[in-house]
Amino acid sequence: THRGTLFPYTTLFRSPIFDDTKRWLDIYFEGDVPNFTPLLCPEGTHFRQQVWNYLLQIPYGKTTTYGALAKKMAEHLQKQKMSAQAIGGAVGHNPIPIIIPCHRVIGTNGTMTGYASGIWRKEFLLELESKK
């Protein structure tokens, strides 16, 4: 254990979940494809969680559009159609970016849109993945 100086009575501990997440991020930022997904328990509405599950299915180094995700979700929910804006709202509320790869979703015309951490980071992540 370690006692911090700001909170001297707080004990920090190691967690397998944090260790797995760190290992996943280390592999990812070395430019390799992690062959596992750390335990994820994001909180959100049922709809958002469904969208985030679709994000996890986008292959490393590939992209999809908000419109394509909307079409998949409409089929999944047995609806005639769904708006790309609804999908964008769920993607924008992704609480675990990078691991849940919202950076792999682009505009219909190929534009880099809607990344809360900045478009330059989205471009960086896609460039990193394109090298593999």
Where are these regions (language model features)?
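Single conserved hydrophobic/aromatic residue that forms the stacking wall/gate
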Residues: 1-11
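Basic nucleic-acid-binding alpha-helical/helix-turn surface characteristic of O6-alkylguanine DNA
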Residues: 10-78, 130-132
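Residue-level signal for inorganic ion chemistry
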Residues: 55, 69, 102-103, 125
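Major-groove DNA-recognition helix of helix-turn-helix-type DNA-binding domains
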Residues: 91, 99
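…primarily DNA-binding HTH/wHTH and HhH modules…
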Residues: 108-132
